[in-house]
Amino acid sequence: GSRAPMTVELSPKIVTVMTREDIQRSAAQTINDVLKLATGVDVRQRGGFGVQTDISINGGTFDQIAIFLNGVNISNPQAGHNASDFPVALADIDHVEIIEGASSRVFGTSAFNGAINIVTKKASANGVEANVEAGSFGSLGAQGRLQMAFRSGKWEQAYSVSGGYKRSDGGTENSGFEKGQGYANLSLSYDRRLDIGAQLGIASQSYGANTFYSAKFNNQYEKTDHGIASLNVSVHNQGRTWEVTPAVYYNKFKDHYQLTRGK
């Protein structure tokens, strides 16, 4: 295996691509809902709306997959339980690529059973999106996205920024949650020979972890924070018969757990 560009038809592994049209038809509310639709992917949620989710492929464990955002590894090296702390919202996503089968040689040791790559939308025009939702048990959510696209000579520029918030008191004891995320993306292209991409994302959530880790304790609590940043450059000819792609990225998690809430 290699990271060389390749079509789905030529790939030696099973590759599933969930397009934006697939996502819209599915009526999914979270990224986890989208992943549930893929054959071979097992998604097990302990809480509602994507709160702490175990994601596995082909019968493996949640620690045996690698998760990428626009090709940047955002997996949690500490615990796969928090792999679903995505710094992007469903509205940001263009498509999701799922590779089934051992991929450690290409994507690192965590990709023992496969890999998931979330690809965000690239702005092609100026636009604004916003939505607000409310429901029972004190549920409330809001999401907004701003995008801009410009062309100046041989330069193409695309910018997008988004943010979201969701909370609920929960339908059972100690099952409430509060979560938020923010994401920004920059894309520059010159004459189909140079591409520069940068992204910055944060996600934070706190929730009642009722019997998450032990049935004896129903007043558990957990708070997680996830931050990512990356910069990548691609230098290539117009036919992309050769390509050089240096990249740097930052990926940090913080996890605070209380066996008994408030103690």
Regions found by a protein language model. Give the residues of each.
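Membrane-embedded beta-strand positions of outer-membrane beta-barrel proteins
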Residues: L35, I116, V128-V132, Y159-G163, ...
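Short strand-turn segments of transmembrane beta-barrel domains in outer membranes
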Residues: A115, T120-F150, S162-G163, S168-S175, ...
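Outer-membrane beta-barrel channels and translocator barrels
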Residues: F62, A123, R151-W155, S189-R193, ...
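N-terminal periplasmic "start-of-domain" segments of outer-membrane beta-barrel proteins
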Residues: G1-Q24, D54, Y183
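Short acidic/polar hinge/loop motifs at secondary-structure boundaries
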Residues: D54, V72-E100, I118-K121
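Extracytoplasmic beta-strand/coil segments of soluble accessory domains associated
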Residues: N32, K36-N76, D94
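Flexible loop and strand-edge segments within Gram-negative outer membrane beta-barrel domains
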Residues: S168-S175, K179, R193-V244, Y250-K263
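Non-catalytic regulatory/gating segments with a bias toward low-complexity or hydrophobic composition
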Residues: I23, L35, V96-E97, I116-I118
